[in-house]
């Protein structure tokens, strides 16, 4: 869990925050803003509620408020590689001449191979990408089950993000199905505003997801520094988010954890949706009964535990839009109070917003899901045709031809300036991991390995000669 020691804006910084607001009237009663007033409560422990799936209730992360500057950024690196060992320090200095072997899914039928894998020997599988193919550079994030690293693929020098998750922690939390679903869902997605999975594999102790490295920072990070977004900028960001969520729904996937921390920005300023740890595949006219998400962005039907469908994502999009336009979510307080407000309280819309912004927020933030914008037969088209999006050319937008007016400072593919120094200064050495069950049949992560096909296979066209 992220430490609760957060940099709190002082009075001068608060005044700077207020000065960029389009109207002083909306904030005149909030001159002495506290950090939690702007971004919601500090992290709390998730409570466990009995549902048909393990309850996963996140609190907001406040880890992206203090990046290193571009001027002081240094790319002086120690050559490191990834190593899986019985002692389970999986990131160690690479010793010259040392040979590493790769352990792919130990789910084969050969008992001798399974025994070797369980004894700590790593079995090399020809043509499959594994830990020995990557050189670690920096820590760029941390989650419930492990860390996220900036890595370089040795063969091509391409830069990626590698999400490393400890199996023992996953099993302790009973989250194996979530992790498998994340991997499976990522293999089915191909969209200009969604981070792509490039490779996945596993070793005895850990799971590995290798994804696009997006280094423009988080939407949350830019929102913190700008205070709030102008409507024209928020419109482009929201349109890109709507496009991404619409693609997921067309694929039969709910994201279920849409929030600024899960929306990255690329070097051109486009949004990139990430983190599918709570995503779920669904069938039309069916509901999920799990209690999951991040409290501030949960739809009322999730809080009530009455079952939810893809309409819950559109509520979260509405909360995101509200936060972009006003600087903070509509409901603040302790986790319990926020949940009560989500179910009972009306949302107050600031007067400085346009009538069109009021209309789309009211549509997305309907407490009854069947009345919510995007829940009708036309789905996302209902949102895309809303008058607030008048002027958005959706074909050009999805071709990445509509450029946001803000472009983050990025000095190159390796730049980590938009990541918090609390991560990038962190040691790349990981903590020990307990050994999983010695029974190969108990491994729930079979068929985890994946290599994304080249674009020519994903978008293959036939040519007549």
Curated annotation (Swiss-Prot):
Q: Please give the residue positions where the record annotates the modification Phosphothreonine.
A: 449
Residue window of motif LVxCxE motif: 91-96
What is the main EC category here?
transferase
Q: Region (Activation loop) spans which residues?
A: 275-301
- One Pfam entry for this protein is Pkinase
What does the record say about domains? The activation loop within the kinase domain is the target of phosphorylation.
Q: Which residues form the AGC-kinase C-terminal domain?
A: 390-460
- What are the binding positions for ATP in this chain? 140-148, 163
Respond yes or no to whether keyword Acyltransferase is given for this record: no
- Report the subcellular localization: Cytoplasm; Nucleus
Question: What more is known?
Answer: Plants overexpressing KPK1 are hypersensitive to osmotic stress.
Gene that codes for this? Answer: ATPK1
> E.C. number, please?
2.7.11.1
Q: How does it assemble?
A: Interacts with RAPTOR1. Interacts with RBR1-E2FB complex through its LVxCxE motif. Interacts with TAP46. Binds to MRF1.
Gene Ontology CC terms, in alphabetical order: cytoplasm; nucleus
Put simply, this protein is called: Serine/threonine-protein kinase AtPK1/AtPK6
User: How is the enzymatic or functional activity of this protein modulated?
Assistant: Activated by PDK1. Repressed during osmotic stress.
What positions does the domain Protein kinase occupy? Answer: 134-389
Instruction: Tell me what reaction this enzyme catalyses.
Output: L-seryl-[protein] + ATP = O-phospho-L-seryl-[protein] + ADP + H(+); L-threonyl-[protein] + ATP = O-phospho-L-threonyl-[protein] + ADP + H(+)
- Tell me, in a sentence or two, what this protein's role is: Downstream effector of TOR signaling pathway involved in osmotic stress response. Could be involved in the control of plant growth and development. Phosphorylates the ribosomal proteins P14, P16 and S6. Functions as a repressor of cell proliferation and required for maintenance of chromosome stability and ploidy levels through the RBR1-E2F pathway. Mediates the phosphorylation of MRFs (e.g. MRF1).
| PTM info | Undergoes serine-specific autophosphorylation. Phosphorylated at Thr-449 by TOR.
**What tissue specificity is annotated for this entry?**
Expressed in all tissues.
Instruction: Alphabetically list the UniProt keywords.
Output: ATP-binding, Cytoplasm, Kinase, Nucleotide-binding, Nucleus, Phosphoprotein, Serine/threonine-protein kinase, Transferase
The record ties this protein, via PANTHER family, to: RIBOSOMAL PROTEIN S6 KINASE
> What GO terms describe the biological role, i.e. biological process, of this protein?
negative regulation of cell population proliferation; positive regulation of translation; protein phosphorylation; response to cold; response to osmotic stress; response to salt stress
């Amino acid at each position: 869990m992220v430490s609760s020691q957060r940099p709190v804006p002082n009075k001068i910084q608060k005044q700077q925050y207020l000065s960029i607001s389009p109207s002083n009237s909306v904030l005149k009663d909030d001159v002495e803003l506290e950090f939690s007033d702007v971004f919601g409560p500090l992290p709390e422990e998730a409570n466990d509620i009995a549902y048909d799936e393990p309850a996963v209730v996140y609190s907001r992360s406040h880890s992206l408020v203090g990046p290193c500057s571009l001027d002081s950024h240094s790319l002086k690196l120690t050559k490191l590689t990834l190593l899986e060992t019985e002692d389970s320090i999986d990131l160690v200095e690479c010793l010259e001449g040392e040979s590493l072997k790769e352990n792919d899914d130990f789910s084969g039928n050969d008992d001798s191979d399974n025994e070797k894998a369980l004894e700590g020997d790593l079995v090399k599988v020809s043509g499959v990408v594994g830990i020995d193919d990557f050189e670690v550079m920096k820590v760029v994030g941390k989650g419930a089950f492990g860390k996220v690293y900036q890595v370089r693929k040795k063969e091509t020098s391409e830069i990626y993000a590698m999400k490393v998750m400890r199996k023992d922690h996953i099993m302790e939390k009973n989250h194996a199905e979530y992790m498998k679903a994340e991997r499976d869902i990522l293999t089915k997605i191909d969209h200009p505003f969604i981070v792509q999975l490039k490779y996945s594999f596993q070793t005895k102790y850990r799971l590995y997801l290798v994804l696009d490295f997006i280094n423009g920072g988080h939407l949350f990070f830019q929102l913190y520094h700008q205070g709030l977004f102008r409507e024209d900028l928020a419109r482009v960001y929201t349109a890109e988010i709507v496009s991404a969520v619409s693609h997921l729904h067309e694929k039969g996937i709910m994201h279920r954890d849409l929030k600024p921390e899960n929306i990255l920005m690329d070097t051109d300023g486009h949004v990139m949706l990430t983190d599918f740890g709570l995503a779920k595949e669904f069938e039309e006219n069916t509901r999920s009964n799990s209690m999951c998400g991040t409290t501030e962005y949960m739809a009322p039907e999730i809080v009530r535990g009455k079952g939810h469908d893809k309409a819950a994502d559109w509520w979260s999009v509405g909360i995101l839009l509200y936060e972009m336009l006003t600087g903070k979510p509509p409901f603040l307080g302790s986790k319990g109070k926020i949940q009560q407000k989500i179910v009972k309280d009306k949302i107050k819309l600031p007067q400085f917003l346009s009538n069109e912004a009021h209309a789309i927020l009211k549509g997305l933030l309907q407490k009854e899901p069947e009345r919510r914008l995007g829940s009708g037969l036309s789905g996302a088209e209902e949102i895309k045709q809303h008058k607030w999006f008048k002027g958005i050319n959706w074909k050009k937008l999805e071709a990445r031809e509509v450029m946001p007016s803000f472009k983050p400072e990025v000095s190159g593919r390796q730049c980590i300036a938009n990541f918090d120094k609390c991560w990038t200064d962190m040691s790349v050495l990981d903590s020990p991991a307990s050994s999983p069950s010695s029974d190969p049949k108990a491994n729930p992560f079979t068929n985890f390995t994946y290599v994304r096909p080249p674009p020519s296979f994903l978008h293959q066209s036939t040519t007549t000669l």
